[in-house]
Amino acid sequence: MRYAPLPILLLFAALLSACSESFTDPRDGQSYDIVKIGSLTWFAENLNFVTEGSVCPEGDSRNCDRYGRLYTWDDARTACPEGWHLPDSADFASLIEDAGGPAAAGESLKSSSGWFKKGNGSDALGFNALPAGYRGAVEIPGDAQSEQSAKYDGIGGYAYFWSAVATPDDLAYYLFLDFSSKAAGMNAFPKGDYRSVRCVSGVK
């Protein structure tokens, strides 16, 4: 019988250990895969902690199991468990840089399945970005524009992760990935929109 060299066995064991790392949220007992990328440790799943205002993608509770919940920016700021926080711009900048820079980071960050039109990523870093889509701000009865924006959209095609940083004109930044691009970038949308949350821990 032939045995693999010890260094290879140790490397394999280390990889298995990294893949199996998890964190259990003491507030509700839900467990999340986590991954260390650079100096930061990230949730490798979308947050699924129930807050009063959070919703499931497409309004379907089964989607919460797969994609986590969608949060307004105000909810997102306090949704992460103790010891974790909503990423700021520097956290996301570090993530994008570690994933190959703005032009290539989307490919490395997107999950290897679940994106439509051949939009899957390589998930090279284990971040496992999931295309949960979004929901517009809550509609105002009788306001046609708000009723349109309040609809769910983008599941399977887009991932949006809130940051902790707001703009002077009452918008908030988020990390954006889409099925048709290998890039990753930041944009800003109204704080009342519902988007995904990835919690992060560590010092940049």
Region spans (language model):
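Bacterial N-terminal signal peptides
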Residues: 7-17
